[in-house]
Amino acid sequence: MSSSQNDIPEPVFVGGSARSGTHAIGRLLGSHPNDLQLPIESRFHCGTGGLTDLLNGNTDIDAYRERCLGKWWQRGLRQHLGLKRLIERDDLEAALERLRAGLDDDPLQAGSRFVREILDPLAERAGKPVWVDLSGANIRQAPTLLKLFPRARFIHMVRDGRAVTAAILKKRDMTDDLAQAFGHWEMRVRRSDAALRQMPPDAVLTIYLDDLTAHDREAQFARIVDYLRMDDPAPMRAYFDETISPERAHVGAWRERMAPADARWVDRRYRRLVRQLRREGIDWVPEPGGQ
């Protein structure tokens, strides 16, 4: 990135539908010496009932505090994820009290300071000026996050809805309901589009997973480098060449990842939905093509 640390765009928020490649691009960015991929999706800043909802009046500080110290403190099948990976509990409680105290005077400043109290020390200990968060709701909450972090960058990961559906069905801790899996993709698309319409031009970089991994690798890699103002992308380039591949992303393999009847159902629904979304002006979803 830029040799002047003040010119480095930070932080970086990556978001999109579940199973759309957010973690793949997070690891790619984390291979750069300046970028720390956070060890978890932090969620506390953008999830439902999170900090952005607090700042927008959709929840209150007591309910938010309870979430931070409760369901967001530890989560996952083995309860190994959550804020406990990022901060000591006593430090989190103290930061929450400072957030409470600052909300009346300057809520945006208080919110930004709260996020930085939790996440900046991780990057500082790693000797990196930028942290990268992969919470799925980052794009949905991008308009508020941009107010908190005016120098932030947002990467919107997009993937064919049929491939997302197949990947969700394969994920043990998500769902095995076909309609629910497909509905998740549609919901995320609509919510993301509503947020994107509120963002300034060129504030968000949209990356199609299939293009990044298979169809347009060089151009997509260059777009990421330019967007993040990277002076020396060589370490990231090495990771990209060695690790980012069509095979790992299961490009074009969604039919093989579900039962034939389910694949036909998803294909029909996807083609109809893409036409409907186009009519609504949502023109960034991948075309079904001949797949």
Q: Which residues fall in each region the model found?
A:
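A conserved segment at the C-terminal end of the G1
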Residues: 23-35
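P-loop (Walker A) phosphate-binding loop of NTP-binding proteins
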Residues: 17
